Structures are given as C-alpha cells and as structure tokens.
Amino acid sequence: TPLGVAAAQTLMARLFPENPPRLVILREGLTAPAHLSGHMILLPAAALDQTDGPDVVAGYVLAEQLRAQADSATAKLLSYAGLIATVRLLASGSLSATAVEGYAETFLAQAPLPVSNDDLIAAFKAADVSASPYAFALDPTGQSVVALIEKDPFLGGSPRPVLDDGAWVSLQGICTD
C-alpha cells in the first residue's frame, strides 16, 4: 500500500538519516531479516505482525544493517555461483538463472549471522532507540539477551518515537491489498 511504503521510508529515514537503505517487507518466503546488494533490508511480514510496536522492528533493521555492513551479499552470490559463472558475469553482464535460483534457495534457508552486543548497542544509541523491546522480542524471558537489556542506552524507552501511531499502522498494513 502507498501509505505502508511511505511509513517504511519514514522508518528508514528515522534510523539512518544520512543514507537510508530501502526496506522491503515480504509476505512469504522469508523467515528472518536479510539484506541484499543495493542497500536493501528485507523483513518478513511476521516481524511486524508479531510485535507490539515499531521499536522492535527498528531493532531488526538496525541488526540487519550491521550484518549488511559486515557481509557482502554480492560476494556471497558470486562465491556460490563459482569462478566460471563469475567470469561469465564479468564478460557478458549476466549471471545464469540456475546460479541465481540455487543461491536464492540457500539464501532463504540461512540463519542470520550473529551481531556483537557492543555493535548493536552503539547502533541503538546512534538511532535514539531503546534496545530492550528488541531484546525481549528475541527472548521473552530476557535470559539470553541480558547484556542488551543491561546496556540499553535508553532503558526507560526511546527518547523520541520511532514512528507515530498512524505510520506504525500503515507499516503493519504494507502487505495487505
């Protein structure tokens, strides 16, 4: 929906004011956050459906952006495709559909790489977002994410809203037609 797309853009501009990545919400096929080349963050629609507010979604996005900075999606694709396919890509400008389809299956089955708590806390602090809602979304007991909770730079809540209520509702409805 247009309002959902606008809300996604607002969220990304709020989290990354200087160079916001594009946020794409996928209704099917994705079970965990991911990133693609071209400065794109992917979230499963369930990440929006199973949370009470935008602070959790902000956490998923911040964590995935850290993964994107540490890990090139293009390099992974070319590594999967192999040397011959990579040389063909350089010579012809295209990659075989077989290589892309095979990598897509592998890509969708991968679990997200871990992100260091210190890097996450720094990202939350830079974005003015509380880390605790994200931490409790990962582990409702808080036991495995106690470091995120204890080091939360905004333990009482984000100092400014991640999204207003209208934008949050629009973002949640992004996949409805």
Question: At which residue positions do the language-model features occur?
Answer:
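Soluble catalytic domains of enzymes that build or remodel membrane lipids, polysaccharides, and related
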Residues: 32, 55, 62-114
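Peri-catalytic and regulatory segments of divalent metal-dependent proteins
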Residues: 1-75, 81, 174-176
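Metalloprotease/metallohydrolase-associated module, dominated by Zn2+-dependent proteases
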Residues: 88-177
